């Protein structure tokens, strides 16, 4: 049985950054990413996709406290995690992150890794109203899946709940084509709600059919490199939204700490969703 090391308490970003990096910690809070709301009648929201590589950083050290500190930097409303582990002990990564963020947890594990469940997860400030697991496994390939969670963002002033679909697609081109077709068919037949699809789509080919299909359905979103974290070249992590007008901006989070905490950078998107009418409003 593999034992997890004792974990340190959550540290601030300056304490947790790579000791070899002497650069200042960037001021990259969600508020600075998104700026002021553009118009009345809109509710702002920040959403992140983050492949945390089992909390093993670019220095090959298991340090979930660094992932927790990156999440503190981001201060997002919803975080989709990939390559996250969970187990019966609070020393496992997902339990550790949930304890430090205080967010609701939705797990979507696809296989067992060592003595832990392994796969996808959502951290959300909003209570989940409904959760469905989508099996995206292709025969002969690693098990894959997606979380479909409807969250009660009406608590933050939104006019309706929000559907969040979080995934991690396969490594083979044919596998990804099959998985994207499954996801798009699923979204097209689901109950209509504002929908965010996000995750590590593992798509290296910008001209490939999976990205073209996704852009055709959701409309194109910015191409932002997130991998590898030290010198990002590839936009493996993606965020789409329907309707597209809700999306304000997409950016990778490139703080010194994020560059060492995982082999992927977090991808952060800012949204403005229709706000609920105030009581007594005409």
Walk through the language-model features, giving the residues of each.
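Active-site regions of metal-assisted phosphoester/phosphodiester hydrolases
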Residues: 1-78, 89, 99-100, 104-282
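A short beta-strand-loop structural module common to alpha/beta enzyme folds
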Residues: 80-85
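Short, surface-exposed acidic-centric catalytic microdomains
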Residues: 92
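Serine-esterase "nucleophile elbow" of acetyl-processing enzymes
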Residues: 95
């Amino acid at each position: 049985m593999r034992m997890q090391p004792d974990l340190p308490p959550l540290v601030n970003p300056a304490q947790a950054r790579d000791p070899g990096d002497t650069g200042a910690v960037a001021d990259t809070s969600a508020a600075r990413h998104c700026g002021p709301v553009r118009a009345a009648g809109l509710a702002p929201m920040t959403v992140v996709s983050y492949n945390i590589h089992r909390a093993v950083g670019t220095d090959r050290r298991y340090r979930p406290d660094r992932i927790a500190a990156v999440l503190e930097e981001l201060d997002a409303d919803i975080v989709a995690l990939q390559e996250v582990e969970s187990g019966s002990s609070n020393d496992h990564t997902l339990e550790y992150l949930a304890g430090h963020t205080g967010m609701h947890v939705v797990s979507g594990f696809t296989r067992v890794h060592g003595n832990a469940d392994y796969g996808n997860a959502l951290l959300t400030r909003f209570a989940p109203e409904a959760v469905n697991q989508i099996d995206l496994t292709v025969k002969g390939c690693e098990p894959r899946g997606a979380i479909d969670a409807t969250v009660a963002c009406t608590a933050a002033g939104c006019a309706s709940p929000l559907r969040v679909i979080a995934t991690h697609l396969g490594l083979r081109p044919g596998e990804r084509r099959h998985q994207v077709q499954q996801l798009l068919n699923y979204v097209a037949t689901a109950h209509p709600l504002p929908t965010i699809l996000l995750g590590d789509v593992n798509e290296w080919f910008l001209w490939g059919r999976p990205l073209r299909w996704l852009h055709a359905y959701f409309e194109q979103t910015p191409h932002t490199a997130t991998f590898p974290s030290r010198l990002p070249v590839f936009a493996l992590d993606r965020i789409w939204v329907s309707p597209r007008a809700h999306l304000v901006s997409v950016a990778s989070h490139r703080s010194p700490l994020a560059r060492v905490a995982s082999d992927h950078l977090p991808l952060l998107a800012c949204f403005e969703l229709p706000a609920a009418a105030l009581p007594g409003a005409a």
